[in-house]
Amino acid sequence: MPVMKGLLAPQNTFLDTIATRFDGTHSNFILANAQVAKGFPIVYCSDGFCELAGFARTEVMQKSCSCKFLFGVETNEQLMLQIEKSLEEKVEFKGEIMFYKKNGAPFWCLLDIVPIKNEKGDVVLFLASFKDITDTKVKITSEDKKEDRTKGRSRAGSHFDSARRRSRAVLYHISGHLQRREKNKLKINNNVFVDKPAFPEYKASDAKKSKFILLHFSTFKAGWDWLILLATFYVAVTVPYNVCFIGNEDLSTTRSTTVSDIAVEILFIIDIILNFRTTYVSKSGQVIFEARSICIHYVTTWFIIDLIAALPFDLLYAFNVTVVSLVHLLKTVRLLRLLRLLQKLDRYSQHSTIVLTLLMSMFALLAHWMACIWYVIGKMEREDNSLLKWEVGWLHELGKRLESPYYGNNTLGGPSIRSAYIAALYFTLSSLTSVGFGNVSANTDAEKIFSICTMLIGALMHALVFGNVTAIIQRMYSRWSLYHTRTKDLKDFIRVHHLPQQLKQRMLEYFQTTWSVNNGIDSNELLKDFPDELRSDITMHLNKEILQLSLFECASRGCLRSLSLHIKTSFCAPGEYLLRQGDALQAIYFVCSGSMEVLKDSMVLAILGKGDLIGANLSIKDQVIKTNADVKALTYCDLQCIILKGLFEVLGLYPEYAHKFVEDIQHDLTYNLREGHESDVISRLSNKSTVSQAEPKGNGSINKRLPSIVEDEEEEEVEEEETTSLSPIYTRGSSVSHSKKTGSNKTYLGLSLKQLASGTVPFHSPIRVSSANSPKTKQEADPPNHGRKKEKNLKVQLSSLGSAGTPELSPRIVDGIEDGNSNEETQTFDFGSEQIRPEPRISPPLAESEIGAAFLFIKAEETKQQINKLNSEVTTLTQEVSQLGRDMRSIMQLLENILSPQQPSQFCSLHPTPMCPSRESLQTRVSWSAHQPCLHLQAGGAHLYHGNVASGIWSVDPSLVGSSPQRTEAHEQNPADSELHHSPNLDYSPSHCQVIQEGHLQFLRCISPHSDTTLTPLQSISATLSSSVCSSSETSLHLVLPSRSEEGSITHGPVSSFSLENLPGSWDREQMMSASSERLENFPVEVVTSTADVKDSKAINV
């Protein structure tokens, strides 16, 4: 029959063995990884060592096994070298050395370092024990001084040897025996008795089972249990029958069952012997194979009952030993074997048919027992001397009906024992199942009382067994039914998908183990209907172990209640991997029981025990955290895990605690699984010797410096060019300085206007122009400097702190006006060094120069990739903002043209023109200046200037071009400040226009002359002005006018010299409109010009 097997997977109990044989985890010892050649990092430290040295476990983990952090001023340098040498050669070291605690207090320590091997014989760990011998050392030193003064010599050596022997006894105790060397003993052949290893091996130990140990779930044991079950039922039937019906009256009948009784007794005795050699399942769910533990367990549980039930009373009859009748009653003790049936009832209740069979058997057994009692009552009344009773007893009535009455004072005659038993059983069964039929009835008082009890018991049994068999099965065995249903589903799944035997075994063991832990109860499903308040209290009680960590001391009760809802319970079997390298970390794990190891490339990086926390340092903005190593279970482990998704939700609800949690978790983690963290540890260990030379001797402390990037100093021009190439956003000053290097302002402005005409430059306004050269253009323009930038030597410093979060970058356009010295100094964005995790700035030894160079190259490449990614994101955002600005300006222009009211044209007085335009000025141009602007707006009581337009030519005296039109300082007014000069053609005299005050906008429209010319009449040229500030000290705009060629065809090229000879002297002003608004500065400054050569009659938006 199927039985719960228990936990059989091989476990690596190395940590438990060390802790147990060291008298608990409070002993002073550490374990270090012997497979990492540089530094031999510590993978486990006991609580006693932390108390001795004054360091926390998180501060000791991953430090060097040589314990340089305990060295001080008076530490013997020769012993330091010997420790390093013994670690390199992987040999044992013992010695007395002066160490220093965290607070700087010195103490003498007896240090013993022993290598630990695995099953292959390779040294994988170092076990270092520490014993404080300060008191002994001081006492011995004082005694030595006294002896030196009296005898002139020292005897301290013997005391040192005794102290060393006392400390070595602890390590020898780990092997399970003390090495005793006795003289006068014969040497035993090593081939027969091989010495056990001095220390336990670091490996997964298989269950060692002797061939004389019987598995409790084996097939033989299952068949034996069925045989013992039948023997138990035999005892339950025959013992009451022999006591009540036979007694000492019919020894022949008794002797007929003697053989079967002796056989049953022999079976019980053999069962006792087998129980001393049968495994059992402990309370923790593990299978116990040790013979001594099995014996102790059996003796303290069922041995006494089984021994009494197996006493061979029937052997007394076999050897013709006369016994009194009371000895027969001792056989009723065998009924205690039924208690064993109750113990194994859960094993037999796996199927409904077995359950029904057992219930019916128990019902029949109860009827048998009550029949025996019913016969004893009739027999006692028959033997009574009262004549009034024996005549009405049920046996007397039965004898009359069977025509075998009693006679001779009721001692002779009467029905046979067989007939009496059948009649008694018939009466009890009819009474238990119904009210009886009356053919066998109770006549005396005793019989009536027994009949009443039988009816009550029958009603109860009938209701429980026959009336509610289905309800009994569902209520009593529903959990087992669910267990076997799921087990059957699991086996069907394995059979359908043809899973291998190893995977099948793992699945079955995991299912059985998890079922034994939670008994098939889904806590989430069970608690989902409870209110949140009650559910939070329940989960806080269930997860109180992890919530009592120092990590959650600063959390409020509400935060803990919310967090407890996101804590789950997990289980891991020996050899199972909790996490694989490169997996996405989904939770933070807390080890409740068992031990685990952290592996990378088959090397042990850390050993985790009860109370350890494993995960990664967090950031609020983290999306995916990849693990850097494997986490494998050594024993059966119970875990509690905090789901990261729920954790981030809770931290979002409690921001005052979130920052504290992010800071504290990196100190409370026993091992950090964040990808990239282990390279920092190995690098720190590999350079430990170099760093220790720079640090002063004394107690080691953790260095906590902010990460930084230190670059080699170069020329100032190279720094400016490299800074410009870091980001797609440039300042106005850098653009102007670059234009001065490449050419004149006129050439640079001409290039910008060509780009504007083609629509490739995303300007925000006609007077807000910021040159933004792409990185590609920059590299093409200056390849030598770009090459020098790649060859730049980066020196990187690493902090022991965890990685910081990525800084937020807000893309924006930096105008040159933000800094008064923008034309002299280049403004760039400073990307913080917190987003980069560099290595310590150290000078590696010559043997490690290649490793350091390769590591720096990798870090530099990662940094470049991050910067390029940021540049692309900022560029994309800038383009989107520019496109949005252009769309908004187009919409505002349309609204202004629609909503602005029309007014009659206002003409200005004539103003003499000092000169006629030359061919170089025959290009339409709009210029702004501080003294004589063409279009000028000044916020807050400023004046709006405008000028008329003639022949499509606007010009301003170049000598009057000044600083930015945004200047608000007052300047001396003169008549020329409120007028606009323009260059007329031929004999036309220009006019100057009046000033329009404050909240007005003016719209001017000019059309081509009405006189006959060789030039085709143009469409109207319009200019509108709205009121925002200017962002450029100088902006020029080129317009292309259509012209007529000599053959008379219309062209759309630029105006040539011969086509302008017949240009009229003036253009007629078609109309002038002005509109008012509340605040002119709310409108963007823009100039919109439209000519015939624009496709689809669309305006050129600047």
UniProtKB/Swiss-Prot annotation:
Chain ranges of the PAS domain: 18-90
Sequence intervals crossing the membrane: 226-246, 256-276, 299-319, 328-348, 358-378, 449-469
Keywords from the UniProt entry: Glycoprotein, Ion channel, Ion transport, Membrane, Potassium, Potassium channel, Potassium transport, Transmembrane, Transmembrane helix, Transport, Voltage-gated channel
Stretches buried in the membrane, not crossing it: 420-440
Sequence ranges on the Extracellular membrane side: 247-255, 320-327, 379-419, 441-448
Domain of life, per lineage: Eukaryota
PAC domain location: 93-145
CDD domains: CAP_ED, PAS
Compartment list: Membrane
SMART domains: cNMP, PAC
Pfam families for the chain: cNMP_binding, Ion_trans, PAS_9
Polar residues bias spans: 684-693, 724-737
Keyword Transferase appears in the UniProt entry: no
Cited Gene3D superfamilies: 1.10.1200.260, 1.10.287.70, Jelly Rolls, PAS domain
Subunit structure: The potassium channel is probably composed of a homo- or heterotetrameric complex of pore-forming alpha subunits that can associate with modulating beta subunits.
Its job: Pore-forming (alpha) subunit of a voltage-gated delayed rectifier potassium channel that mediates outward-rectifying potassium currents. Elicits a slowly activating, non-inactivating and slowly deactivation outwards potassium current at depolarizating voltages from -30 mV to +50mV. Shows no obvious change in the activation rate from different holding potentials. Activation is strongly dependent on the pH of the external solution.
NCBIfam families documented for this protein: sensory_box
Protein name: Voltage-gated delayed rectifier potassium channel KCNH8
